[in-house]
């Protein structure tokens, strides 16, 4: 039914029971019916109403169109979304960071750090080796100070132990390439032919004072009698055999200088070594009673046997005290021929004390 026909029928129904109404009231009632149109599309028809009828309608009774409502809702939605996005957006980064360059720097730094360490010990550096060498010196000094019974005895020997030129020279030669090329000096990193090794590495160890024993038991042809120009250590003559029972390590025996005994051959000195305690791998060996074991078939091999020397072999080392028949044997310490360099490489030094 068209809108005009419905409106005219409504006017007829209102005019039938109440004829005393004014014309303005009838139009207001019809406007109420038009504004409460239930079906869709009424807004479109409402816009096409005559202008004269629109002007006569009051303001609160006119509803906004659906397009206006949709436009308003769309605006509110966009505004709220823009505000929410503005609030959620983080602040711009003030400093631009090149993450790839940063990671490359970190990798380079850590690769250089770990390439200087030995492969077997990732947590240890080469510095503990140098510290260990400095800690060993006071221990050896205390070991050497132990057997001295008299306050002024053995002063010259202590100075010689501290001032060992061969040991200091080897230590200086080994530390020099480590400072110049720290990466090349570590074992397992660079091939042997490319390492910066000292010249003494390729030679046999040659201690300052060594004995070259021939078949006859005498000194070799290229070495003369040792320690001719050196003075004897003072205060070692009155030492008795009770001072020889102090256990000493082979390293301390190797570092102590041998005594000067004129007129005694090397065989006598070697045999005399068997009467002194010799500690091997922490097991001290003390001299037993004379003549307890049978005599060795080769007298010059007294160095390698653990049995004590015999009276015939030690006759030239003992002297009478005041002619009473009491004999006092002097302690004799010989320096063994070393089979390896005095300063081992750092990797073996670390494993050797575990």
Curated annotation (Swiss-Prot):
This is Protein FAM181A. Residues 1-14, 129-142 have a biased composition (Basic and acidic residues). It comes from the Eukaryota. Residues 1-35, 117-160, 172-193 are annotated as: Disordered. Disulfide bonds: none annotated. The lineage of its organism: Eukaryota, Metazoa, Chordata, Craniata, Vertebrata. InterPro entries: FAM181 (IPR029359), TEADIR3_omega_loop (IPR053819). Belongs to the FAM181 family. Pfam families: TEADIR3 (PF15238). GO terms for cellular component: cytoplasm.
